[in-house]
Design a protein with these regions (language model features):
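Conserved loop->alpha-helix
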Residues: 1-102
Length: 102
């Protein structure tokens, strides 16, 4: 679940499309020490799962269905993207509850 409140504006580092899965890499100012593998991050409102991270960026796999149903497949290198990490039970609810699932 997400609040819909943007935490950071990242920059698309790379979008590799090929085969059954695409990979999206984003440069971000989010603290890398707070990220974990498998964490959910909303990229332009789309819930993605972190598959790797480090050096100020993270990578997530993107399914063909997600590319077809969202604007993620039309992004180009350097595009600015809105980022939000998933809501924790201890967080304040300053926005609205949204899921981000495709």
């Amino acid at each position: 679940m997400f609040t819909g409140l943007i935490e950071d504006i990242g920059t698309l580092r790379e979008l590799r499309i090929g085969g059954a899965q695409a990979q999206l890499s984003v440069n971000t100012g989010l603290p890398m020490t707070e990220l974990t593998l498998g964490e959910s991050i909303a990229v332009n409102g789309v819930c993605l799962t972190v598959t790797s991270f480090g050096d100020g960026s993270f990578t997530a796999d993107v399914s063909p269905e997600t590319l077809d149903c969202t604007s993620l497949g039309r992004l180009s290198r350097g595009a600015r993207v809105n980022l939000e990490r998933a809501l924790r039970f201890s967080d304040r609810l300053g926005g609205h509850l949204v899921s981000g699932h495709v």
